[in-house]
């Protein structure tokens, strides 16, 4: 390790931080390697930047596909401590948010690109009537749009009643959610016009059913039926696995959160002050669960550069607990 040295514009601050840690009895072996890795990143990407900024921290803090949970957490913890040290010394620095727990780091989620999202809904919108189900081609375009536009869990979409959606105000009551935590969200206007037409069509076929999204018998979707329909649409749209990431029904929810945070970033808004609203909207039991998306987001920036988010500007309004 004696042959390794810090070379970026942050080198003097990094060396002082390592000395500070060792002076207090910390071996700081693997942590030094992490900081050296960050230093090489800064030398290549920010050769003249001597301030620890949010952009450089977030770009380096993306979990790698081959990285274990423990390895990832060790790496970002080192950078978080470096940021705290700089602030303690009176320096301006971005501190990586706390909240990640060992053993609970999920795999990198699949996030729909603009092209894949467009392909998926183009397929659902042009599905033909299936001989074994008179409504499948009607349900798919609406149910999966609710999962994306409102960030719903698959089970939340399955349990929706027709009376849960107010097509005049956009108010959507989410029942039987995870942790038995009911909540209210609001659907964007673009989705409401589609919903009105859908309800008219479904009511004509199954007038007695209370389910929002019905199977071929007019009953609530089962988990397996919903999964089968998603896979049928995904494969029909030609959406493939990306690296180790495979699109699943939760990808709509991951995409909703990631696209929303990206839009805030694009608009120059303070993401840290808006995350609690997103956390409540999505029904997260802990604010830390929402923080995960901050660590997955930088990798998606280049893929989403041409995405039009303006029509989803109403996706996250006030959240009401009931």
Model regions: which residues?
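Conserved catalytic core of the tyrosine transesterase superfamily
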Residues: 1-322
């Amino acid at each position: 390790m004696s042959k390794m040295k810090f070379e970026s514009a942050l080198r003097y601050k990094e060396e002082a931080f390592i000395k500070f840690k060792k002076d207090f009895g910390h071996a700081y072996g693997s942590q030094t390697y992490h900081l050296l890795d960050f230093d090489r990143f800064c030398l290549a990407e920010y050769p003249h930047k001597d301030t620890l900024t949010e952009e450089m921290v977030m770009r380096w803090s993306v979990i790698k596909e081959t990285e274990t949970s423990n390895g990832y957490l060790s790496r970002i913890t080192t950078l978080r401590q470096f940021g705290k040290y700089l602030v303690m010394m009176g320096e301006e620095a971005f501190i990586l948010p706390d909240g990640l727990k060992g053993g609970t780091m999920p795999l990198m989620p699949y996030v729909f690109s603009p092209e894949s999202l467009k392909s998926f809904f183009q397929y659902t919108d042009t599905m033909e009537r299936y001989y074994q189900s008179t409504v499948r081609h009607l349900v798919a375009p609406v149910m999966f749009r609710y999962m994306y536009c409102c960030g719903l869990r698959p089970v939340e979409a399955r349990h929706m009643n027709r009376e849960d959606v107010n097509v005049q105000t956009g108010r959507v009551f989410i029942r039987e959610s995870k942790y038995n935590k009911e909540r209210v969200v609001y659907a964007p206007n673009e989705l409401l016009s589609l919903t009105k037409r859908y309800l008219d069509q479904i009511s004509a076929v199954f007038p007695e059913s209370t389910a929002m999204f019905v199977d071929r018998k007019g009953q609530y979707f089962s988990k397996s039926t919903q999964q089968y329909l998603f896979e049928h649409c995904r494969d029909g749209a030609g959406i493939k696995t990306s690296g180790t990431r495979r699109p699943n029904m939760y990808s709509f929810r991951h995409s909703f959160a990631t696209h929303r945070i990206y839009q805030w970033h694009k608009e120059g808004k303070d993401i840290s002050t808006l995350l609690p609203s997103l956390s409540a909207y999505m029904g997260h039991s802990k604010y830390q669960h929402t923080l995960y998306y901050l660590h997955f987001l930088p990798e998606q920036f280049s893929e989403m550069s041409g995405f039009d988010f303006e029509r989803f500007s109403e996706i996250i309004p006030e959240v009401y607990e009931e």
